Amino acid sequence: MAELFYDADADLSIIQGRKVAVIGYGSQGHAHALSLRDSGVDVRVGLHEGSKSKAKAEEQGLRVVPVAEAAAEADVIMILVPDPIQAEVYEKDIKDNLKDGDALFFGHGLNIRYGFVKPPAGVDVCMVAPKGPGHLVRRQYEEGRGVPCLVAVEQDATGNAFALALSYAKGIGGTRAGVIRTTFTEETETDLFGEQAVLAGGVTALVKAGFETLTEAGYQPEIAYFECLHELKLIVDLMYEGGLEKMRWSISETAEWGDYVTGPRIITDVTKAEMRKVLAEIQDGTFAKNWMDEYHGGLKKYNEYKKQDSEHLLETTGKELRKLMSWVDEEA
């Protein structure tokens, strides 16, 4: 079972005694920087020259400096720029500013897991990964609550890396909800698998296949959209609140019976075997290498896939139907 840690297990004074640089000011960056500041931590934000986020960070009362300067000043450096550019930012602005005893933090383990970033032996390497988007992390913190976090230590140069990581998690509200101890390898591999096989890749492929099956059989695209995409939110919300049990308790007996007898015909042993192949490609680094090659090669295939899906009948139908739904903008 998972090892859980709460407020009483973490010493906030540890992170309060350090100088923290948050590199990046996107979804997670703003939540980390503002919440750490409000927890009494000495924070600066490191941004590249010309960053559009600079004005926003300064308006919110944070000190913004170039990335290299932030790294030189701080002894805890949290890298929260997008995965594909982390290695470049590290090599250019962070690597030469690290000192023995410093700590390098990440919000996701990809660049450490696959060796794109190789920290020196004298620094702690930790991860604090909230299991929610940045706006939720910040809102929960402000309301006196928190979002559960994953915490990991890849390199414990000082002997105090885990205590430091727990302290950091407490500074952003994570220990109020609960912190789960993991490893960089476990977090990275499960995160990528979940995204590809279930949450993004799996769901979008399932929705498109269902929509295409109905429209190819002569049903109206609008009706197919409602049945295969729109109502997905109702089911996912129920699962989010109470797992499969609450979802099945809430739907009709007809729908529940269809779940039991038809679901296994759609997600078959063949599908699961393909999932195992996907996991193997994540574990052996194939996916990470291919993704980095694609990104640094100009994103040609990525943009082709994106364009194809934007022109799919599912998408064009949805754009028109959502104009009928006044509540959609209100929920966004």
Swiss-Prot record:
Which keywords belong to this entry?
A: Amino-acid biosynthesis, Branched-chain amino acid biosynthesis, Magnesium, Metal-binding, NADP, Oxidoreductase
Q: Would the keyword Ribonucleoprotein be found if you checked this record's keyword annotation?
A: no
| HAMAP family, A to Z | IlvC
Matching entries from Gene3D superfamilies are given as: 6.10.240.10, NAD(P)-binding Rossmann-like Domain
Q: Where are the active-site residues found?
A: 108
Pfam families associated with the record: KARI_C, KARI_N
The membrane-spanning stretches of this chain are: none
Tell me the protein family, please.
Belongs to the ketol-acid reductoisomerase family.
Q: Name one GO biological process term.
A: L-valine biosynthetic process
GO CC term, one of those recorded: cytosol
Quote the record's binding site residues for substrate.
252
Please name the pathway: Amino-acid biosynthesis; L-isoleucine biosynthesis; L-isoleucine from 2-oxobutanoate: step 2/4; Amino-acid biosynthesis; L-valine biosynthesis; L-valine from pyruvate: step 2/4
EC id: 1.1.1.86
Record-annotated residues binding Mg(2+) 1?
A: 191, 195
InterPro entries named in the record: 6-PGluconate_DH-like_C_sf, KARI, KARI_C, KARI_N, KARI_prok, NAD(P)-bd_dom_sf
Cofactor(s) this protein requires: Mg(2+)
Q: What does this protein do?
A: Involved in the biosynthesis of branched-chain amino acids (BCAA). Catalyzes an alkyl-migration followed by a ketol-acid reduction of (S)-2-acetolactate (S2AL) to yield (R)-2,3-dihydroxy-isovalerate. In the isomerase reaction, S2AL is rearranged via a Mg-dependent methyl migration to produce 3-hydroxy-3-methyl-2-ketobutyrate (HMKB). In the reductase reaction, this 2-ketoacid undergoes a metal-dependent reduction by NADPH to yield (R)-2,3-dihydroxy-isovalerate.
> Where is Mg(2+) 2 bound in this sequence?
191, 227, 231
User: Where is each KARI C-terminal knotted domain found?
Assistant: 183-328
Q: How is the cofactor bound?
A: Binds 2 magnesium ions per subunit.
What residues does the KARI N-terminal Rossmann domain cover?
2-182
Q: What's the protein here called?
A: Ketol-acid reductoisomerase (NADP(+)) 2
Q: Which reaction does it catalyse?
A: (2R)-2,3-dihydroxy-3-methylbutanoate + NADP(+) = (2S)-2-acetolactate + NADPH + H(+); (2R,3R)-2,3-dihydroxy-3-methylpentanoate + NADP(+) = (S)-2-ethyl-2-hydroxy-3-oxobutanoate + NADPH + H(+)
